[in-house]
Amino acid sequence: NHHEHEHEHEHEHEHEHEHEHSNEEQTCSEQNPIINRTHLSSVASTVGWICWNGLNFDAELVSKWLSNLSQLPGVIRTKAVLRTNEGWWSFNFVDRKEELRPNGYRRDSRIEVIIEGKDVPDVQSLEQELQTCLV
């Protein structure tokens, strides 16, 4: 019986995962402008945010922030597509290499930090830093 329960739980989890994408599109709004999506795994974890597209990031500040993040111990890379005061930009920081490119319009801004193992930085304080990058 215990085994069955586990199986059901796994199934539910997979089910949620499949539909995660459509759910998260609706939850980003003026009332709830920044949503955290953290996924922990022993191999590599991701800490990410989805930001309502009414938010405008300061391109220079957010670029510095992402660059600093990418150099934290354990961080493999940071990437983002953000609406900035200079239009939509995609950012990619890995091994001190930076790629910044103009990007087309998106429904929302997204940030993803990829980290080795489960030892992730404090998500709440990162989110506060992120908010200081808003215009």
Pin down the residues of each PLM region:
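C-terminal accessory "lid"/substrate-recognition subdomains
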Residues: N1-S109, K118-V135
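Flexible loop/N-cap segments at domain edges
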Residues: V113
